[in-house]
Amino acid sequence: LLQRSMPENEFLQEFECSFDAAITGAYFARELQEAESRIASVPYDPMLKVNTAWDLGISDSMSIWFYQQVGREIRVIDYYEASGHGLDHYARMLQEKGYLYDRHFGPHDIQVREIGTGKSRLEVAAGLGIRFDVVPNIGVMDGINAARMTIPRMWFDAKKCQIGLDCLKQYREKIDEKRGISFGPLHDWTSHAADAFRYLCVALNESNPATRTVDRTVVSWMG
């Protein structure tokens, strides 16, 4: 009787200890469930340049997705997050990963000048050799919809993207259950990864989708 009165995903989470069941209110639950076969080993292709998408959060929290593109196919090869570091830390991290980079995408507020330095993070990053393209501010929900439409084109490296994927799977709306009202995304530990992912997807829809290679065109490894 109890199972009949509860949504199936809630019953599985609560009583069957299923961690694969969708989180109630999770924005990307269906899309990521359908993408399960595309969460695998997705190696870095040295013949393709790497793009990054960043969320530069408060208290120096940072989330970064790394991806390569062949036509409409998006290969999400890596994810990185940290906090308590300056931009110089991330400049070193980019270099240490050894990828050949093309474009770095950041949120619109990267252009805001900080009171302490009088410089924007856009300017500070440029001084460290990281030149950002600013992603248009289309609003959170439109960004979420852009992500939902883009996930079917994506492959994710299961190992390197595990933390980021865990965030995406649990990124959910804040709901007043008594009144049935949604207050938009719940701001928690999943937010920075999800925001950076939104910027990735918005950038894909706004920028030139052409494949950028090092010195020759590479066919899709999907076969």
Q: Model-predicted segments: where are they?
A:
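Mg2+-dependent endonuclease catalytic cores in nucleic-acid-processing enzymes, primarily RNase H-like
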Residues: A22, W65-L186, S207-N208, R212-T213, ...
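ATPase catalytic-site recognition across NTP-hydrolyzing enzymes
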Residues: L1-A53
